[in-house]
Amino acid sequence: MKKLFYNILTMAIIATATVSFSSCEDEQIAYTLEGTWKGNMYISSYYDGRSYDATYTEITFLKDPYAYSSGNGYWVDYYSDAPWDYVANHIDWKVDFGTIYIYFVEEGTSLRISDYHLNNDRFYGWIDDGGNNVEFELYHTSTPYRDYRWGYDEWVDDWYYYSRSRGNGASDTTKVEKPIRYVRGK
């Protein structure tokens, strides 16, 4: 009986340690992920019967100060041969047992990143939208508040947008069809 008690107690301690170690790892992943990343996510948008490939993508992950491994941010795909310059979305993201889940607020769609390598400078691996599993590569361009000099130097974000003018006589009240984003194969 005593041996059975110790075996059950040992199993409970191991299970607790496993859960607590993975939550610390999730927090570290979220901390490293925070900031702006730029590169190729192999994203395309379908619009008006045509498919357009994004030239590059910028993703800003902002960590929630009250949650250890989640936050929100922005995902912007830039295009050079499309009727628009970029497609931007607000995102909600979380890290759960090492897997990064990204939810596009305006589109109501999700992506999952589970097989990846992440350090302070580079983020690469595989992204899955539920139907396609595609390789991606991003480089870290900025991080808010790290190495901040508290009054001696400002953190400046080079985040800005501009778009082509409509030029076709359409007014700002014209309802425009949104492009549909999807992950494309290489």
Where are these regions (language model features)?
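Bacterial N-terminal signal peptides that target proteins for export
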Residues: M1-T10
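Bacterial Sec-dependent N-terminal signal peptides
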Residues: K2-K3, A17-S44, D158, P179
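Generic short beta-strand segments
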Residues: K38-S45, S70-Y78, D128-G130
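Short, surface-exposed beta-strand/loop "edge" segments at domain boundaries and coil↔beta transitions
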Residues: Y47-R50, D81-D85, E107-S114, G130-L138
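N-terminal glycine/threonine-rich, aromatic-flanked beta-hairpin/loop signature
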Residues: R50-I100
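Residue-level recognition of conserved beta-strand positions in structured domain cores
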Residues: W75, F104-E106, D115, I127
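Edge beta-strand at a domain terminus
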Residues: Y86-F97, D128-K186
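Ser/Thr- and Asn-enriched, surface-exposed coil loops between beta-strands
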Residues: D96-G98, Y116-F123
